[in-house]
Amino acid sequence: MIQTSVFTDDFSGLNPLEVPLVEDGREAIYFKENRGEIGQWQVVNSLRQQGFNEAWQVKEGIDGTSLIQTFTNLDQNNEPLSLTTHPIVVAGDSMWQDCKIEVDFTPMAKFDKCGVVFGYQHPNEFYFFGTEGNTVILKHISQPVTPLRPFERILEYKDLVWTPGEEMHAVVNIRRNGVTTILNDSIVLYNEVTVLPGRIGLISDMPAQFNRVEVSMLKGEIRKLSRKKRQLARREEIHLKNYPKMVRWKSFETGAFGTDQNIRLGDLTQDGNKEILFARSSNKGKSVCCITAMNLDGKIIWQYGDTLAAKQEWGGEIPFQVHDLDGDGKREVIFISQNRIHILEGLTGKGLNRVKLPRSMEISSLQFGDFLGTGRDNCVLISDNKSRLLLLNEKLQVLWEQEIEEGSLPLIYDLDGDGYDEVMAGYSVFDHEGSLLFNSGEFIGDQCNGVTLTELVEGELSTPCLLYAAGDWGMMYVDFEGHVLKQNLVGHVKYLSVADFDTEVPGLEVISSNAWGSDGLVHMSDASGTAKQVLTSSSYVSRCVPVNWKGDGEEFFVTSADSVSGGLFDKNGELSVEFPNDGHPVNCYHVSDLTGDARDELLFWNQEKLWIYTQDDNPRMGATYSPDRYPLYNHSMKQMNLSLPGW
């Protein structure tokens, strides 16, 4: 049967100097449009192993240009990292199903996998055909059932005598009732398996060279695919009409004082409206060089420091907040710079107080809580998010300090309802006096990326618990006494949020986003901790921020500010609100109610401009959903989110 080519790449169009944008660990905070791109291909995962993220490169030789994989997928102890993940690039259409794939490749070693990926859903769900050791093999790789161990099912294999450096020619024929694979026109494998639609890819756990890829389909399949795409586009068009569209409300040029991730919101002028605070650090680190306060009309209220200082591109988070620390009804701007805590008058930016911290430490977060039982969040919690906590009162006097084995951004919350806040940092929980209540980390085998609160519902029983983003150990549910209740293995969980994403079922849902080996994999779990939906965000790792867009009690979530890969998505992972393709900035985003109708606006910005979007039916009349969230004065880009129902 004659087939028509739908994809061809001999890599001749690639620049030998072209390398994919290297993962820097802050992909959820700073969106970069070309992340992982190398020609028509996309690097799908990253790993905490030197050399892994730079594995795919372009090589120009006597025989032409090739795509090469340069990394040996072993750890420092020569243990196989393929138990965790693989260097993979993918291309093509996620709806490809019945097709023929041909790949010419040259493995430079034989200890692990090298070959073709097809039926690709995400980094933990795909089919593989190629060489593995002294075999030619067909496998199905699927979601892990234990930490760091994706399930690999051998479908067919045959012994293979070969020498590293030999060029291989692989053919994969996918039909509805099975897969036929051929290596070097001689070794045939067949398995009756139904392969879901998915992209194609290249995989290698060892240095290898890929010379040519072609995908072809029957003309009838091409017509069927085009028809299905039209149907899906029409369905999406109808779905999008059900919700308020996004329109630009405000836009400002901020080149003179713009910043990276370091924006805060708060009512500085006591007029009932939030103002925007821009903080800029020096190139030397987290020392504050300037702060600018601007209202929602774009008017600069005041500036502090040296606005002419050079910007730090893609910098870390500066410890600064907007909060009424002394309880006089007027908010202050509080920040830490050069081992001193500074307090500025919110209305004017005038310095009110400056105190040197009792010991030198690298400060990463600044938060507030009620540790004295006064009914006000008048205590200052300072942390390096790694190993140290320091608590001050409103006069900036030390109340207590603690060292922890392994920390995270702290969460401040009154767990037992006694009027005094507790601190959750890493897997450790401290009471208001700094005494350790428990540490559940001894039961968990990876670092804590963050913690939030939820209720685990099992039948008639509902248990308040801490929910940890536990890295390779997935999501961990721990009760308020430190007992592990449930583990949900969904890959390396980096961020998570709890909100009412589905009003048709009881309880709150959890959305989680992965990194390190399963980048961009998003799971929607119900109140029992069972994953109900799985999707792959093309924006890669997402902060999973809930968005109260409709105001009817059901929230969406945002993946990124990009008009192509971003948007607001619903409980089923369907795009529900498109972001305008109008040239808006896409590097950073923030979610908050700015117009006063209880629904959220979205702020998109880079270092040169900031745009604000709202609903096209704003303001909303009648009862409007107004969820209860962690206070803005404890905001961090690293936080795990909680959005409790409220009207």
Name each model-derived stretch.
Residues 97-99, 104, 157-171:
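Trp-centered recognition loops
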Residues 96-97, 109, 162, 174, ...:
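Beta-strand-rich recognition domains
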Residues 1-50, 54-55, 60-61, 65, ...:
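Beta-propeller-forming repeat regions
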Residues 71-144:
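Secretory/extracellular carbohydrate-interaction modules
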Residues 117, 137, 180-182, 292:
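Beta-strand signatures of extracellular beta-sandwich domains
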